[in-house]
Amino acid sequence: VEGASLLDWPITLADLAPYYDKAEKKLGVTRTNGIPGLPGNNNFKVFEAGAKKLGYKEVHTGRMAINPVDHDDRMACQQTGFCFQGCKWGAKWSAAYTDIPRGEATGNLEVREHAHVARILHNDQGKVTGVEYFDKDGALQMQKARVVCVAGNSLESPRMLLNSATSMFPDGLANSSGMVGKNYMRHMTGSVYASFDKPVRMWRGTTMAGIIQDEARHDPSRGFVGGYELETLGLGVPFMAAFLDPGAWGRSFTSAMDSYENMAGMWIVGEDMPQESNCVTLNDAVKDKWGMPVANVHFTDHPNDIAMRNHAYKQGKAVYEAVGATRTFPTPPYPSTHNLGTNRMSAKAQDGVVNKWGQTHDIDNLFISDGSQFTTGAAENPTLTIVSLAIRQADRIASEMTRKAL
């Protein structure tokens, strides 16, 4: 694709499938391992009815890491909505109240709060030896490590590698390819909302339990490569006021907000094109409170992203118009949703930052464990893949440490 820096992942589905299975069991993903799907709320019922009128076939309440029944010492979803604000019931999987407490209970995990990593340290042989971090009082501390795993998301992870530059690694750690920070992706996104004559109350029930997957395919006849999904979405009033039509004023906008109770909504998520010019760099003129250069984030849509979004707007509006919408509201993409790329996985060292294990090409005891290792974004929400890669990487590190290779 012209203008894109597409690259094949150095792993296959066969490599990852066993770890997807482990992740689905760990997270309690619905519609896997005998776990039923979540019930559909009114927002989903409107969405599903319109989808079926358009002939869509792959329509259901999604594969969610939210309990539809009591599972894994967590209660079932109580359908109280506003899932973006956190889950008061603990039905939605979160490492904060599942894996971290369990890890601490083993005695083998220590979580240090209020710790901000300044840089990763290395020795004269180029092996990482630990990290320096600022504690809650601003004092600089040091933690030695046999292996360092970086999981700061696609903005903070490259920033950390770049801020760890030394005379041995003048362009930052693991950056011999010049690819650290490059190929930032955030998914092609947008939303479509619609008003109806009767109340929908989209905020009730699980916020995003609804999906149309028919468009998640490669079909260039639509005017773009790759694919996208449509997912139910119900925003709270403050969020809706900010994002329905940013900067809007006047009666057209306020009348739309007046119809909030009668609104249905969906989110668009699709594969955006990696571009080297979409990147994270350091801003040496602006420092954080610890005196470290902050990240600059550069992003511009690829023409393929724009074509895909326009197609999704058209289809989203058609879904609602098929079931009697009185108004539809295509909304602009959110500033960032799923931060991906910037330390991408590659078979060849010159093409990326890490290998198929998330192990940096340049430093064998330095790993990247988050979404920044994604080579491409795909049309899916990324959490399950991030967790699957992390489990696979952990197995690899344990194996390599056991045989003293690390």
Predicted regions located by residue number:
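FAD cofactor-binding and catalytic pocket of flavoenzymes
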Residues: 9-13, 177-295, 303-306, 339, ...
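Hydrophobic (often cysteine-bearing) scaffold residues that line and stabilize catalytic clefts
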Residues: 40-43, 92, 96, 308-312, ...
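A short acidic-Thr-Gly-centered motif at the start of a beta-strand
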Residues: 99-105, 137-142, 345, 351-361
